[in-house]
């Protein structure tokens, strides 16, 4: 996993735009984690919502269209609590919000990790799988490390 982290960080550091950074993140993390879905939701301060900005595994046409209020759904819960959420049956959680346009219905396992920069939640990285299971501690640690290291790149890319 360390080799994968190094590769991801090198690619992100050479990216020229926020969309490119996010595309690298979702593709590489999904591949390394062997997940069905990897998505990034970023906070849009103009309307206080988390917006699906990149995904590998959900319907591409849902990018930019899925918008959750700051405390809506599992994404909002992860952001609000500022800590990872690892669920084997996400659709059974009281905070679960289903968005038909994403095509996420076959995915049950959920790992959400906040992307935090200078104590400010920039967004949430989400991993999903079809089978019902908790993500392993090593997988969660990998996702947390990715978010911690990439928060600065996302903040920088969003500011330029």
Give the ranges of each region predicted by the language model:
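Signal-transmission linkers at sensory-effector interfaces
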Residues: 1-20, 31, 122, 153-160
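GAF sensory/regulatory domain recognition
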Residues: 27, 38-66, 91-93
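Signal-transducing coupling segments at domain and membrane junctions
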Residues: 60-62, 88-109, 129
């Amino acid at each position: 996993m360390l080799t994968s982290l190094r590769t991801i960080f090198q690619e992100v550091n050479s990216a020229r735009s926020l969309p490119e950074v996010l595309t690298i993140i979702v593709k590489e993390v999904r591949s390394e984690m062997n997940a069905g879905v990897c998505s990034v939701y970023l906070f849009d301060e103009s309307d206080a919502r988390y917006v699906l900005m990149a995904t590998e595994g959900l319907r591409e046409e849902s990018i930019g269209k899925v918008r959750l209020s700051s405390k809506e759904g599992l994404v909002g819960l992860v952001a609000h609590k500022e800590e990872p959420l690892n669920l084997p049956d996400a659709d059974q959680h009281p905070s679960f919000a289903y968005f038909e346009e994403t095509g996420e219905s076959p995915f049950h396992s959920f790992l959400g990790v906040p992307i935090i920069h200078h104590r400010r939640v920039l967004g949430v990285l989400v991993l999903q799988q079809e089978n019902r299971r908790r993500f392993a501690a090593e997988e969660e640690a990998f996702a947390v490390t990715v978010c911690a290291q990439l928060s600065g790149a996302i903040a920088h890319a969003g500011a330029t």
